[in-house]
Each structure stands twice: as structure tokens, then as C-alpha cells.
Amino acid sequence: MASGLAEESELSPGESELAVNPFDGLPFSSCYYELLEQRRALPIWAARFLFLEHLESSPTGVVLVSGDPGSGKSTQIPQWCAEFALARGFQTGQVTVTQPYPLAAMSLASRVADEMDLTLGHEIGYSIPQEDCTGPNTMLRFCWDRLFLQEVASTRGPGAWSVLILDEAQERSVASDLLQGLLRDTRLRNLPGDPRVVVVTDPALEPKFQAFWGNSPIVRVPREPGGDPTLAYKDTVPTDLVEAACQAVLELCQQEEAPGDVLVYLPSEEEISLCCESLSGEMGTLAVPGPPPRVLPLHPGCAQAIQTVYEDTDVSVRKIVVTHWLADFSFSLPSIQHVIDSGLELRSVYNPRIRAESQVLRPISKCQAEARLLRAKGFPPGSCLRLYSKSTLELEAPPLPHPKVCEENLSSLVLLLMRKQIAEPGECHFLDRPAPEALMRALEDLDYLAALNDDGELSDLGVILSEFPLPPELAKALLASCEFNCVDEMLTLAAMLTAAPGFTRPPLSAGEAALRRALEHADGDHSSLIQVYEAFVQSGADEAWCQARGLNWESLCQARKLRAELVELMQRIELPLSQPAFGSEQNRRDLQKALLSGYFLKVARDTDGTGNYLLLTHKHVAQLSPYCSYRNRRTPAQPPTWVLYHSFSISKDNCLCIVSEIQPEMLVELAPPYFLSNLPPSESRDLLNQLREGTAEPPAAATETSSPQEYGDGCVLQ
């Protein structure tokens, strides 16, 4: 495709001073031409016309693009697709780019808006959780892939698409893998506009995607010219990775012959924070010429602060960027000259057999190691220090990243598949098929939640559950709150449970600990979360107020946005709201009932009175989290006998997280009878069955009627 539009973008200021931007009709700014020179220097620029030809003529409507990190794929391909759509007048809709991480979608939208000389939030936009920066004239949108999948499966969405770009497909996110499966299935290739599809990946996964997509054309981005980085290994893995990484950074900073920015890879956010804190303390006293280096974290918790990584500073100020797997393929930083790679990642892996997640510290893949090495490739080539041995990489590292669809709870995935009217989740094409046990467990959980009817199809309740950007059990609890007249409190709780953790981890000062303790509620962790949120709102969302109590201000702001989004969704699907009643005895019981309606699968009983909890659904013993409000009270008290928990971790702490006391009579009342019958043999099951047999009449608490609703009408979940 050699359109006039494509030729226009080759112009320089000297060639046409009157050139106008075809997307908004305004003259190009001088900044546009400066960025155009940088774009032309990217390795992918050489493949531009080949890509446009394949996009025009692909027999399958699909184009594969394979290239190294930093080659310009994520910024240039969306612009070329926008040119393609503009040449057709955007007759079939906008261009949408999916990203595996919300922060990447936001960051790329900002960069592409600058390069195209357009306005962010107008022609160029992004959609991430709790933030929709788009407008009616948005023609190029960057979107978190899970949010886009939710749009495709539900009644929401912008309408139609000219081109759909699945970027960073090698990350193997659940949403990206499922979108490819749905798009490959010709029965489901009925998205509005019948969009062209572009799948962008790393060369290591090119054969896998090529086999999956058949005879679709592929565009291979040439590797950036220049020497390879100097590569060094450690003979053994250090016992303290943070200390070893800090030491390596300090040594680099003291070498005059090693200028340039540094990228440090550590396993987890906790280690990133420790490393940044340690390095920041050292930099002020470091004997180096010029200003001290600037230490910057890069992880999902950074939120809007992520853009500071890209801010132009004095070239004499060295940047030390400390990150983890987030920057394996995303967030290319051209100024990086040196990489320090720990070779490890901390990931959450779901075990469907016991419905629990574990934090697994494991070696990165060979593909990730190569991507990290290439971050230091350039003019002149930099260096890469691997804090592990070459034999460790060769013998212990898997060749490719682990597909997330084989490691996550699949309940939400199966719910979406059912929404797309796939009779059996097993019928969907997967790049890597999940274990049958994981799919069956997801179906079982959805059946317990009444999301499926007697024929195994999605029930009316299941359709409503699929509309919510929440895990199915939390969505069910929110719907149940309509019946129990505690919607206001449950909306707050759903937002707090979904947003990033609102508490900073100890150690806290004595003053911070005392102020935080004052926010704890006697009814348990769930009520404490509601109390924290309400106090935060009453403070005027004051950041200093949060810091004084060891609270994460950005997480609480995120929860506030999510709550507003949930309120809007409840109103759109005409579900009733309720007036606030938090703190009353009736509201306490109603909130417990709503929670149990969704979380009856997550109940445990203290079997010996010492805090050893036996999980109801399987014979596994756990303890309360060290951060649980029941353990942090000034006056020691006997732990509650029966508890409902939000999550269970079988990692090093083996604990129940976010816990509240419940009454077993309430569990018998609200859990499906066949669920109680299917519990494994235990004393807890016997006690519940005795309660069920001895309560032909509802218990006293259950016979009490809620006060009449003052706002909206109630609903009853069948």
C-alpha cells in the first residue's frame, strides 16, 4: 500500500512547511518532525511498507509481526494501522491495541499521541481499569487486554473495529490467549466491522504463533545493528539478591568508563522497594562526578508515576531503573546501557485442587533472559550482569514464558466463554490448553454460584455476573447485597478488595501503627476495609492523612474510582442501591449474609482453639495472616471459631488473608445444600449437617426482616 497518506508522513520541515496532519487538519508542529527522525531510526521502520501490504492483502485477515524488544513495534504498528483505517475513512470503526498491562496501555498512548502530533484523550486514547481517557472522536485506542475481553463478551464496547492489534502476545496473558482463540474460531469471528487482526510477538515465540495462525503472512523486524552487550555471569546465585544488585549498581556508578542508565531486574515489588530505598540512601554519599544518579522504581504499583521513567533529564544525571517481569518486553528505555538481571521472578500460581494461590519464586525463561540482555544493545553496546551461573540458565530455565492460562483461576475465563455461547469451554482453541481439572473446577464453582442452569448453560444470574469486572464470587456477593439491603457497604468492599492493597507493609512507626489500629473494626477485616475507605473519603482523600497511617494513597484513590464505576454499572443494569447503614447490628448481619452468598466456598473452622484453621473444602490447615485485625488487637482474645476468608496463600506464610467471623447457622442457610453434601468428611461437615437437620425452621437471626429500603427496590436471588 503506497497511499498518499503514507507518503505524507515521510515529509520533513524543509520539504513541506505547509504539511497538515491528516488526522486533525492542523499543521504539523516542529516536535512532530523531531520525533519523526527518531521513528525513522527504529529497526521496524524498514518493514513499514511490507507490513502495510500484508495488512491490505492477507488472505486470512491476520498479520503476524515478530521483533525484538525496543525495535519500535508497539509505537509504530498502531500508527500504520491508523493510516490504513484513515485511508478507508474509518468506515468500519476505530483501531484498538490491547496490552497485557494497564500501565503499558497508558504509557504507549501518551507516546503515540506525541509522535502523531495529536491530543491524548481526543484522537488518541486509552482504557484501563478505573480510567477511560477516550472521546467520541477517538480513532486509536490502547486498552488493557482483560478489559477489552470483557467488552467483547458483554454488551459494552465502542462498537466496531477496523484493526485489532494484540500487542506483546508473548506475555501469554489469559486475555490475549483467549482473544486469539476466539478470533481464530470462524464461528466467533463476528466482531463488528470484521476487523483485520495483527498479532505482535517476540521472535522466540514466532514458530508457535505461526503454527497457530496457519498461512497468515509474517513480518520479521530486522535486529538492530551494533555490537552485542558484554555478558557476565555470577558463579553462584547470591543469598541476598537485593544486596548483590545494589553492590553491582554502585560499582557501575563508580566506573568512569561505564556511562549510561542502568536497568535492574529483581523478582518482586517488595525487593524493588528495598533496593530503591537502599540505593537512594547510598547515592547521596557516592563519590561520583556530577549530580548523583536518580533511582526510579518501575512496577504496577507506580501508577501515574510510571511516566517519570521517561522524563527527559540532564544527560549528566544517570537513571537507575529498578523493575521486575513488567519490563521484560514492555517499557523500552533507549537510554539503558547496563542491565543487572537476578534471573528470578515471583509469580502467583493458582492450585484448583485446593482453590488457593501460591507465590512461586522461579527462574525466568530463556526467552526472558534474552530479552533482558537485548535491553543493553545499542551504540555503543552496553553490559549485562546475570546474578546467576550460565549452567543455571541452561539447565533450569524453561525455553519460553509460562502461559498464564495454565496458572490462574479460570472461573472468570469460563464465565466469559459461556457468555460467548460456547457450549463447552474445551471447544475453544487455546495456544496451550488448560488442565482439564482446572476447567472442571471452574465449572463446578460457577455451578455452586448458580451461574449455570440445570442444562449446564449460563443462567440469567450468570449473565449478570459476567457484566461485572469482578471475580464471580465477589460479583455474586454484590448481587446478594441487593437482597440483604447492604449495597452501599458491599460496593465499598468490592472496590477495596479489587484495587491494589491499601496498606503499606510494616515496619511502621509507633505513631503510624497507633493511627492505623484506630481504623480496625471489631467485626473483622472486611468491616475494617469499609471503615478505612470511609475515613479516607471523610479526610478529603488527603495524601498526608494516608501517609500518617501507613496507607497507600494511590490504591485508595483507585478504589474510589472503581466504586464509582460499579455504582454506574449497577444503575445501568437497573439493580437497586441502598442507603448507608454501616455500623448497625442489622447491617453487620446483612453484610455477613451477602459475603457468604458469594464466599461460602472460602470458609474455615478453628479446630483446636489455637488458630489452626481447617479449610472446609479440603483438609488443609492454615493460620490467620500476621496482618489480620484479629491478631493485631491490644488485648489478646481467642480467635474466632468460624471464619470467611478472601484468599488463601500456600506460600511461605500459609495463611488466610482478609478474614471475618461468621456464624455456622448462616452458612447452612445460604450455601447450596448440595455444596454441604459434597464437602469432604470432617468434624466441620458433621456439625453443619447437624445444624441443617436441626433447623427445619430458620434460626432466629434469619427470621428477622430487614428494615424497609429507603432507596430503591429490593431483589431476591434465586
Swiss-Prot record:
Protein name as annotated:
ATP-dependent RNA helicase homolog DQX1
Q: Which domain of life is it from?
A: Eukaryota
- What's the name of its gene? Dqx1
**Species this chain originates from:** Mus musculus
The UniProt annotation puts motif DEAQ box at: 167-170
For this protein, the record's InterPro entries field holds: DEAD-box_helicase_OB_fold (IPR011709), HA2_WH (IPR048333), Helicase-assoc_dom (IPR007502), Helicase_ATP-bd (IPR014001), P-loop_NTPase (IPR027417)
Report if keyword Nucleotide-binding is assigned: yes
What job does the chain carry out? Might be involved in RNA metabolism; it is missing helicase motif III and may not have helicase activity.
Q: What is the lineage of its organism?
A: Eukaryota, Metazoa, Chordata, Craniata, Vertebrata
What GO terms fall under cellular component here? nucleus
Give all residue intervals belonging to the Helicase C-terminal domain.
245-447
Annotated region Disordered: the residues are: 690-718
Protein residues bound to ATP: 67-74
Compartments in which it is found: Nucleus
What Gene Ontology molecular-function terms does this entry list?
A: ATP binding; ATP hydrolysis activity; helicase activity
Question: Which residues lie in Low complexity bias regions?
Answer: 696-708
The tissues where this chain's protein is expressed are given as: Ubiquitous.
| Domain Helicase ATP-binding, residue spans | 54-222
